[in-house]
Amino acid sequence: MNHIPMQNKKVTVSVIGASGYSGAELVKLLMKHPGIVIEELYAHTQAGKRFTELYPSIPCDKTFQTYAGQTNSDVYLLALPHGEALQLVPGIVAAGKKVIDLSGDFRLKNTAEHKRFYGGDKSAEDVLQYGMPELFRDEIAGSTAISNPGCYATSIILGLAPLFLGGMAGLDVESVNVTAVSGISGAGRSAKLELSFSEMSGNMRAYKVGKHQHTPEIMQTLGTSVTDPSFRFVFTPMIAPYVRGIYSVLNVRLASPVAMEPVRELYAGFYANAPFVRLRDGVTEVSHVAYTNFCDISLAFESDGSLVIITAIDNLVKGAAGQAVQNMNLMLGFGETTALL
């Protein structure tokens, strides 16, 4: 593995796209990391401004620069709009640097699905190791380039993975119906009328119904497809007037009844070595995970025998920057929880 030993020197890290909410969250977490030094912050729309002009509560003394192909840092974290990282990552990787991309540019293996859900073309080679530590810890540790999961995808995959990948005998899933609610920060920092206070206060709405870009990412990771006729997956994303957090309610119809105890044992065993996944006895809440890298999971049964899985994450931390730092820790040989607890 191409690790940079923690004890030898501090690792230099630069953030491309540091002016957005996820980028700023990266800066906040990186400032707490004992093994790294923030080298540069790139944001072409804010070039020349000091980071603290945008985020006074985060005491980073860096000035935003314009990225023009620099490869002087050991690690590059990219928090750019979809489509932009495709142009930058190949050059950074070719220079022998480590990369973690937070966009959706390198997640999907199926190029037709990428075009359908994201727009634009990409080649079949434009896929990086998927960065979900709870599922791919060893692969991430041996990688030099990672595609960070999406925020909704993180909350839903972690809720479903034990059912699809845990190997419990007699547990067959017929369909999954997901309603997931996100805080407004999930829509990004750019000004949009529909996200303004007067539009969102006291309001709530569904969006991208039937066409959210995280749907094929979820299916790919769970080992099925959005076009598989034998499996029914319905995902309804919603936005609500709070700042951060994703609350996902997953209603899972099973082919035959199962008892709660073996299901809880399945989840507990599956995540036994996952420091950021917590199986809760009661119903979890967004406030339980806000500003943390935790994913909380609650389990219950409906009267018809359907399994109800509830997950809660912070969309900017576990759903973005925190998971990226978790991946970086694994890539570089740091403790997985460094700067996150």
UniProtKB/Swiss-Prot annotation:
Molecular function per GO: N-acetyl-gamma-glutamyl-phosphate reductase activity; NAD binding; NADP+ binding
Reaction(s) this enzyme catalyzes, per UniProt: N-acetyl-L-glutamate 5-semialdehyde + phosphate + NADP(+) = N-acetyl-L-glutamyl 5-phosphate + NADPH + H(+)
InterPro entries named among the record's database cross-references: AGPR_AS (IPR023013), AGPR_type-1 (IPR000706), NAD(P)-bd_dom_sf (IPR036291), NAGSA_dehydrogenase (IPR050085), Semialdehyde_DH_NAD-bd (IPR000534)
Keywords linked to the UniProt accession: Amino-acid biosynthesis, Arginine biosynthesis, Cytoplasm, NADP, Oxidoreductase
GO BP of this protein: L-arginine biosynthetic process
Family annotation (Gene3D superfamilies): Dihydrodipicolinate Reductase, domain 2, NAD(P)-binding Rossmann-like Domain
Subcellular location as annotated: Cytoplasm
Active site: 151
Pfam families registered for this protein in UniProt: Semialdhyde_dh (PF01118), Semialdhyde_dhC_1 (PF22698)
EC number of this enzyme: 1.2.1.38
A cellular-component GO term for this protein: cytoplasm
Involved pathway(s): Amino-acid biosynthesis; L-arginine biosynthesis; N(2)-acetyl-L-ornithine from L-glutamate: step 3/4
CDD domains per UniProt: AGPR_1_C (cd23934), AGPR_1_N (cd17895)
Chain's role: Catalyzes the NADPH-dependent reduction of N-acetyl-5-glutamyl phosphate to yield N-acetyl-L-glutamate 5-semialdehyde.
Classification via PANTHER family: N-ACETYL-GAMMA-GLUTAMYL-PHOSPHATE REDUCTASE, CHLOROPLASTIC-RELATED, N-ACETYL-GAMMA-GLUTAMYL-PHOSPHATE REDUCTASE, CHLOROPLASTIC-RELATED-RELATED
Family named by the database record: Belongs to the NAGSA dehydrogenase family. Type 1 subfamily.
Xref: HAMAP family: ArgC_type1
This protein's name: N-acetyl-gamma-glutamyl-phosphate reductase
Record lineage: Bacteria, Pseudomonadati, Chlorobiota, Chlorobiia, Chlorobiales
